[in-house]
Amino acid sequence: MKTSSLAPAAMTAAAVIAGCAMLASDSGMLDWSRVPTHSLTLFYPAQSSYQWLRSADHAGASMVAQGTSCATCHNGQEEKLGSKLVRANPLEPTPISGKNGMVKLNVQVAYDAENAYFRFQWKTQGSMPGDAYPVYRFDGKEWKGYGQPRLHPAARKGEQPAIYEDRLSMIIDDGSVPGFANQGCWLTCHRGERDMPEQPTTATVQANSLYAAIKRNDVRKYLPSTRTDGAASWENGRSVAEIEKIKSAGAFLDLIQWRAHRSNPVGMADDGYVLEWRNFDAGRNPFVSNMDGKTRQPVYMYDAAKVGARALTEATMRRAGTALVVGENTVAFDPGAGWKAGDLLPQYYLSRAGASGSAADNKTVKGVWKGGTWTVEWVRPLNLANSDDKALREGRVYNIGFAVHDDNITSRGHQVSFPVTIGFGAKAAIEATRLK
């Protein structure tokens, strides 16, 4: 089977063509030179968490308990904090070699009667766009996951290659979540989550009553309101009925994420929310698992006639534009195609047409990497009526936290901002420009 001559130019064109077709949007027509640019400093938080902020190890714990904003003490200290926390210290037991402690994120915001428009720019550590993602590797008998983010033990030990997509996230509060305006993302980050202290085993999570009820195998972002104890411990969850009441009251956070591999090639971003877990919105994402649960074989392979090969290799897995995009560079997986040990296929396939419901709200998002800088233009519809969204509306102010995942990393290995206010026709730290 031919696998070694994957043509990167052909692959890139095939992977992004669906997204490029959607870029004749209002966002692409904006004269961004007329919209003010705000520079935010995002910093590496290490293993600082909701619980740590309230512990004796944090000098400002008493102020946190009183509801004081993190920025009250630390505004302007982001770069200093990041430089300290990214190195070996009590909050960083597994420092990442060469990891930067800070990222400058330029933010521009505009809106009209129908949409909010965001433009972001940031420099990356990598010398190429971080749009590669872990794959499935054929070992001669089975297809198994291959590649891990840099914090994963297998990547740290060199047992598997460190590989993961770049990502930009916005977490949005409309004032309904107590404490978010002061603490931002730290309200959602807890002991027990992935790559955090006291991470439980899969079996322990599965045995927990809440996690069994919601059918989750690990601990991810959640809000303190969904726990029963003062420490907001992951294991002390409320009932599903109680959590649904919290959601019905609107006391959740919107979490929307642009992903360099799993959404950008089809011109989209995903849509989710944080409550008892980090959930996706109702409907279907643009990215779907490429593993058939019944046959334990991939669903799609590359169309060799279009991209030059049916699979990736170790030499080509990091090349730009390796996403499987249905209808552009894919054919149905053929188990009899002569697969050899070492052949690689992406873990997800992408389908713009297959995305649906509230999960598909972010339909016009364009990310371009050039000269070491990502530029992402993002359209978010105003006045969304879905029960799992925070609707952006004229006349309102929102508390928003930003995060960038860079350099083959996920989970806590990002750089984050303190919460910033954004107003649409209202006074705020960032006031969106009203378009005529």
Language-model features: where?
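Bacterial N-terminal signal peptides that target proteins for export
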Residues: 2-11
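Sequence context of c-type cytochrome heme-c attachment sites
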Residues: 23-67, 81-108, 130-131
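Acidic/polar low-complexity flexible segments
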Residues: 26-53, 140-342, 385-436
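The canonical Cys-X-X-Cys-His
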Residues: 67-77, 189
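Beta-strand-rich interaction surfaces with strong enrichment in secreted/lumenal proteins
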Residues: 105-108, 363-369
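Short, well-ordered beta-strand segments enriched in hydrophobic/aromatic residues
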Residues: 115-122, 374-380
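Exposed beta-sheet edge/beta-hairpin loop segments within beta-rich domains
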Residues: 365-372, 389-393
